[in-house]
């Protein structure tokens, strides 16, 4: 069975090239992206939080599944990496880019909860987990990426 997604966001090709030229290797794969789009589509007018924008591949997948009334907030510490996502995706009025440490952002955020929280960086996954879970609306979804075991056999206790 081939479970490769049949379609992808238009911006994805450019974002993958940008990731390659900047040696950014932590983007979500196509299967994860397809899941993100499906989860976003299941939340009409949903509020979506992405922790770890990276170059924007996950962001593009989320936007591809969201309806016009949905809103996405995406948080990234590395302004240079996030600039790639901003350049390609900021014309979409549904997305708000935040350049900040996701841990600090989680500590300071006092707005409404989110229907979908996608944690693709350390805060919200390995640190600040309880706070991230507190931001999931009742009936909402919390999803993490990149929890594969380390090749060194060590558990993921700190960023490398």
Language-model regions: role of each:
Residues 1-116, 123-143, 147-160:
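A short alpha-helical cap/connector motif
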